[in-house]
Amino acid sequence: QLIMALQTIPSRRLSPQDSAVVSITQINGGEAINVLPDTVVLRGTFRCLSNRVRARVRELIESYVATQPQVSDVQGEISWFPGYPVTKNHALQAQQVREVAAATLGAQAVRWNQAPSMASEDFACMLEACPGAYFWIGTDGETPSKPLHNASYDFNDALIGPGVAMWVGLVEKQLPAA
C-alpha cells in the first residue's frame, strides 16, 4: 500500500503543471519464502523540476510514512540521503552553447527548447555555484542505440570528434584571443 501511495504523489497530490517522479527501486526483506520478515527496507528516488515541488514531495513522503501505522499496523522511518538539486541552465551560457553547437555541428543538429528531463545530474551543484549550461550530445548513430545507464550501452566512438569540437568551441568563445 505504501509503495502504491508514494507513486501516486505526482498524479494525485501535485498540480499537473508540477512535474515529479517518485520511484521505489529496491524492496529488501527477509530470507525465507515462508516467514514474514521483521523488517522490509524500501529504497528509491524522487526527482522534480523545481525546489518548491521538491520540498512538497519530501513533505508528502514523510506524511505517508508517518500515517502507515494507522493503516496497516507497521512502523516506518526515513533516512534521507542528499540527492542532486534541480539542473537549471543560466540563459546566457545556454545561448552560448546553442551558438557554438550550431557553428560546430550545424544548425540542423541542434535541438533547442526540448521538454525538461527528469534526469538527475551532479552538474546541477556546479550550476548552483557558478553560471553555466548543461547540454546533451545525442548518442545515436544511424540507428538508435541502447540508452545510457543500461548494461548493454555501447558508446558511439564517432561522437568523440564532435564532442571535442564542442568543448574547443566553448573554450574559444569564453577566452579572449591571445
Enumerate the predicted regions with their spans.
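Metal-dependent amide/peptide-bond hydrolase catalytic core
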Residues: 3-178
